[in-house]
Amino acid sequence: MGKLIRMGAQERRSLWPKRLHWSRPLFLLGMLIIGSTYQYLTSPQGLPTLWAAVSSQHPVKVASRDLSNKEMMMVSSETSKSSSEMEVEAWAPEATAGRDGTPPGIARKNTPSTPRGTASITPAIPNNYSPTPTGTGKVKEDTSATPSGVLNHYTQSRPMVNSYTRLTARGEVKSSRPTQSRGKEEKYSPSPLGRMVNSYAPSTLMTMPRSHGITPRTTVKDREIMATKKMLATNPSKRLVEKTTPTPLKGITDNTPTFLLSDLETDTLTSPRNVVEKKTLTTPRRVDSNSSTNHQGLVGKNNLTTPQGMVLEHTAAVSEGQVTISTMTRSSPTETKASTDAWKVRNPLPRTSAPIIRISSATFRGLLKNPSKAPSTPAAPRVRANPTIQVRHCLVVEPAPVAPTAPSPSWTTAVIPGIPSPSGQPDLYPKAEYPRDLFSVEERRQGWVVLHIFGMMYVFVALAIVCDEYFVPALGVITDKLQISEDVAGATFMAAGGSAPELFTSLIGVFISHSNVGIGTIVGSAVFNILFVIGTCALFSREILNLTWWPLFRDITFYIFDLMMLILFFLDSLIAWWESVLLLLAYAFYVFTMKWNQQLELWVKEQLNKRPVAKVMALGDLSKPGDGTVVVDEQQDNKKLKLSSMLTRGSSSASLHNSTIRSTIYQLMLHSLDPLGEARPSKDKEEETLIPEAKATPQAKAESKPEEEPAKLPEVTVTPAPAPDVKGDQEEDPGSQGVGAEAENTGERTGGEAEAPAEGENGERSGGDAALGGESEGKAENESEGDIPAERRGDDEDEGEIQAEGGEVKGDEDEGEIQAGEGGEVEGDEDEGEIQAGEGGEVEGDEDEGEIQAGEAGEVEGDEDEGEIQAGEGGEVEGDEDEGEIQAGEAGEVEGDEDEGEIQAGEGGEVKGDEGEIQAGEAGEVEGEDGEVEGGEDEGEIQAGEGGEGETGEQELNAEIQGEAKDDEEGVDGEGGGDGGDSEDEEEEDEEEEDEEEEEEEEEEEEEENEQPLSLEWPETRRKQAIYLFLLPIVFPLWLTVPDVRRLEAKKFFVITFLGSILWIAMFSYLMVWWAHQVGETIGISEEIMGLTILAAGTSIPDLITSVIVARKGLGDMAVSSSVGSNIFDITVGLPLPWMLFSLINGLQPVAVSSNGLFCAIVLLFLMLLFVISSIALCKWRMNKILGFTMFLLYFVFLIISVMLEDRIISCPVSV
């Protein structure tokens, strides 16, 4: 409990008590005030006597809780004289008898010997009442010998606040709202245990009510308490709070109802009614007493749930009760009853109605007026408490300084009600522990809240940068070190990298803000991912999304199972430790399944394949390895090994964070002008984007063949694969390559990697995107502008490709493609390439990164670093090209030294060029060195017709001789195609292989780009410089404090990067939740709603941007599967992990998670998930724009319904 809350009037009203540490000065000041008040009160006639009597029996301890407890300071007035026995200070009252279960509060019952005229006030304090201090510390058990030890020991731990609140004007008391705790009556229902907290009301007499927190008749989540201790009813005291005006001593206590005794106790709050009025905390001390299940806050705080600030206000009511405590000489059953009744009336929470109040001291003749504001004030009256005796001497104790106690936590996080909370429990739930804001609520409402909104949005960007630039790369290094498979890594480490903000938000919600902000954020983020992200991907993709059914089906199956568990656990609004463990085990099961994902996938598909329907599903995606057909041959398996997890989305857990395709937010903001636009490579993207094209069915490819001359060895244009794979491919493909002349039919990309680097440093360009067939994506940004359209063959090859029939090609290509047709012989020096030779072909080569494809009897000699040489029938290719593709047709001869170009030559053509693309028709000769094509581009296209000769030194070569070039080339392609294809089946297989290899190549290039370490280099353009300065406050501290493991020299510090990233994420998450809380407080919406809406969207927007970019590249299913996969981590780790930690720290106590609308929101999420999977399945695993738009709208419908549920505008039909 070591936290005190300052109850200053202003702060009380704001309902947001501030934490303060009690200081000696305040304590001394309070003591002085109490002492002076006591002196003043002792002057009246019988008080000294009464006091003397009381003190003789039980020396009064000032503030049994003693300020130390913060609970209350008891004023011990020394006047022994005041005879008024009234001073019963029986704290015990209210819950006396029935208290047993509740946390003991200190009931200090000073039983006064009844003073002279006063009927003996027998405080109902039980003799054996032994308060157990829970919250505050010292409980004074003071079992008073007083007669009628009615309160047989109160177990309550409430500290006895002996504070005698002076009953100043009863009006004041009135002002204090009794409702506070137990009653909250008025407003705050929870007043568990110690509603007396509120009872600050001055107790006219010395009554020191000891508010037992026990009875929270008010709801308060202490349901347990309530149930058990109905007796607590006596607690009413708080409620009682009546105003007992008894500032006047003697008779003034006019309204001290008999029940007053109990009231008294409940009021025990020493804080004077003033305090109450002020809404001062006073209650806090009570709180301690309340500590029993009731969270101390409760009392002091006025119920756990109730905002702490409220407590104060409510406390007032409580105090009144205590005031009433006039010592009643005896607690006759009748009186007791009356008191109790009255009390009840005031505090309607009858359930606690334990009669305990036996202290019905009729104390003052005047009934307590006790208008308890507490709700249900039903008159309860002015029960005159049969004042057996009027205690003339009301000992009015000056209100002790309010000792703030820790605010009670919101009930949501409270521990289970039936279980008595440990004495320290109240501290577990202090109300939102946020630093004090520089601006007050009024100032924020005047416009300063804009700063909080900006800060919250800025932190969203900071979280994305930390995760993408440091945390995810560090996790990647860890998975490499542990040699974890891609599937398992994607489901564990990479999922954690993407969901780290949500996890930390959940931790902050449980341990710091004590609210449901974490649950709201995770549920809101889940709906955002399922509806908004997937819907947006469908809307913005260039074509209808063809989804891979297996990963989506697998992840949604697990997700539905996990959500059903969560809904069941939410039914009782409590999460027990074993429920948290079950959710964590569900995640472990998911990871285990991912370990055997491929085997499971094959088994499921085999089972489905036995039925016609299954085939439709299985054939749903041809683009993914292993997904295209039920039977996955070795070839596919080998490819899977080659491909990185990102592109094998179908067979691995979908995690954008695990994919090199993902561009970080920092890179997007600084280096991409059009993040949502297609990467440069897809310039001509009318054709299918690289992946979609891959997805195209073999039939489509077959159709395209006839059109495009290439008998298409459709994929003969396999992009260079890593060297190790070269030989294997050679062996596999020899028969299928017969089509040497073919050049890229079907718009496949070739020349991949090789051209990409040469063509530009365009990060977006997926490596080697030059599509040989219809689409050349290989052009660099620079090149694209100076591109001269090729007019041949319908311009299937925009970017130069060299095709020569019967020609001879000599070149040294670093990054080119050499394809040789039948009769060709290939001899090359390639380090990283693939050599594919057709029938009768001879291949000898050392490829760097290129592919040599030779047709039957073809001969190719070349020294390629990264290229492909394609030669037509009888062609000989010898090239020295740096970055180009040489395609030679029959009888063609090409000699060139190209740095960044492609040479295309027709029959009998000779081409020599240094930089550019040369396309020559029959008999055409073009020689150029350092030639620039239109626009002065380094990478241009030169097209020459028959008989044309063009030579250029360093000037533009723009020669277009279009005689028969087009026809000839088409003819050549046709021949090549005829020779090349042995069968459609072989071609289809080749296409699939080549597609995969192309994807891999592109991925590698992008990976290289994305793996670039964070650079603080000053950008060139003004716009980028502005963005750079905007991000510098985030990036610079990260750069200084966290090693970038993407740098080779820093890779060994991956542990520091991992831990440092976690610290930064935790800090940014805290700022995000804090500022969101301030914004919500200003606008008037709860943290739960902020989590469902703003925080959920903010933490998921980086993934949204990445998903849309990936979807536009054709990897739509990857984006969709990733959205569902990340949600599994949130539900099975993000939620249960903080709950489990909380339970372990607090003795395996359950965590309260009740909320007006969260349960219904989870049910809505479940229904939306069923809708999404069923609608996609009905659409045959394709997502059109109409379905995407529908999901987009459903997201907003969900938000509106959730907010209305949380604000109780509508009620949840399935609430529990």
From Swiss-Prot:
S-S pairs: none
Name of one Pfam family that matches: Na_Ca_ex
Tissue expression notes: Retina.
Family: Belongs to the Ca(2+):cation antiporter (CaCA) (TC 2.A.19) family. SLC24A subfamily.
Chain ranges passing through the membrane: 447-467, 492-512, 519-539, 558-578, 580-600, 1025-1045, 1053-1073, 1089-1109, 1128-1148, 1158-1178, 1186-1206
Organism: Bos taurus (Bovine)
Membrane topology: Multi-pass membrane protein
Major subcellular location class: membrane
GO cellular component: plasma membrane
Protein localization: Cell membrane
Catalytic function, reaction form: Ca(2+)(out) + K(+)(out) + 4 Na(+)(in) = Ca(2+)(in) + K(+)(in) + 4 Na(+)(out)
Function summary: Calcium, potassium:sodium antiporter that transports 1 Ca(2+) and 1 K(+) in exchange for 4 Na(+). Critical component of the visual transduction cascade, controlling the calcium concentration of outer segments during light and darkness. Light causes a rapid lowering of cytosolic free calcium in the outer segment of both retinal rod and cone photoreceptors and the light-induced lowering of calcium is caused by extrusion via this protein which plays a key role in the process of light adaptation.
Molecular function GO labels: calcium channel activity; calcium, potassium:sodium antiporter activity; symporter activity
Keyword Transferase included in the entry's annotation: no
Protein name per its UniProtKB record: Sodium/potassium/calcium exchanger 1
Record's compositionally biased regions (Basic and acidic residues): 702-712
Extracellular face of the membrane: 1-446, 513-518, 579, 1046-1052, 1110-1127, 1179-1185
Keyword Signal: yes
